[in-house]
Amino acid sequence: MDRIKDFLLLVVLVASLFACSIDEAQPLAHKKLVIASDFLYPKDAKFFAELSEKEKVAIEIIHMRADSIQYRLKKDGFNTNIDLVFVQSLLGIKTLENQAFQPVQNGFSDGELSELKRIRNNWFLVGKDPFVISYLKDSLDKPSTYRELSSDYLWTSPDLASVDVFKAHVRYQFQKKQGNNQKELKDWLRGLKDHRIAYQEGTDSTASTQLLLLKYSAYSKNKLLAQMKKRKVIFPKQLYCDYFAMAVVPQAKNYAMTKSFLLFWNENANSSKFLQHFGMNALDRIKKGKGFYISPEEILALLSKRN
């Protein structure tokens, strides 16, 4: 009889300890950071495994276009489960320009996020995406500047939407740097349009052989292009760039984790090994007035004025 009592007591004790362990684990199991992105996919959460393990948080990525993010946030209001928005272009910021985002405060200082660039409407620029020129090494068409695409060579792009950012750089240079020479600007843009031809995707095993103008991320993520040994990539001396950016959703349910994510990115902002997962380059340290530099905020302003 005593043995039965001892056994039952042991069972109760084990069950009690097991229940306690479940209760203690519950808060961790429910810690989650939800990121809405127009370029990340659910599988990309693996690149944040270090943060996930350190903070004991599950990172969920919802892939949707910037305009869909805008619609979702407007529809959900403060009931949204999205904590952070992560876009691949200034065009994404433009699309979301009427959406309010949360100022990041509460103990954060500029020093803590020193590798990120704060811009208007509480966005953080976290990486740049240069416009590159790519052609076959044995091609007779070998431009070294963007300007030549407007006058000497036929070109195309697999991502025509991003060319709007490129053209905003051209407009900025002429309006701000070259005395607002409208005639030359129109000639530049007209020539760029006239020299553009239709993009040919290629086949499942053969990449396009055309002269391309595209963002570096688009090139690096296109396996056929990136693995084509005969193709060369040029970074023009006066480099135009688009930018990746993130912003915190107002009253984010997991606000503390969004701050941890920003800190994590800041720690890896200059790691080429980390950034290459996303086709990014580290942000420029060049300041206005020192070397060739066009402020992303100036480009964003020009994009906004186009509508």
Question: What are the residue ranges of the model-derived segments?
Answer:
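Extracytoplasmic ligand-binding site segments that recognize negatively charged/polar headgroups
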Residues: 38, 81-82, 88-207
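Early extracytoplasmic/lumenal segment of secretory-pathway proteins
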Residues: 20-94
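Extracellular/periplasmic juxtamembrane helices and adjacent flexible linkers that interface
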Residues: 253-256, 263-307
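Bacterial N-terminal signal peptides that target proteins for export
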Residues: 1-8
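A bilobed periplasmic-binding-protein/Venus flytrap-type ligand-binding module shared by bacterial periplasmic
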Residues: 132-138, 242-257, 264, 273-277
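Periplasmic-binding protein-like
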Residues: 113-116, 129, 186-192, 226-250
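A ligand-binding cleft/hinge motif common to bilobed small-molecule-binding domains
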Residues: 90-96, 205-231
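Bacterial N-terminal signal peptides
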Residues: 8-16
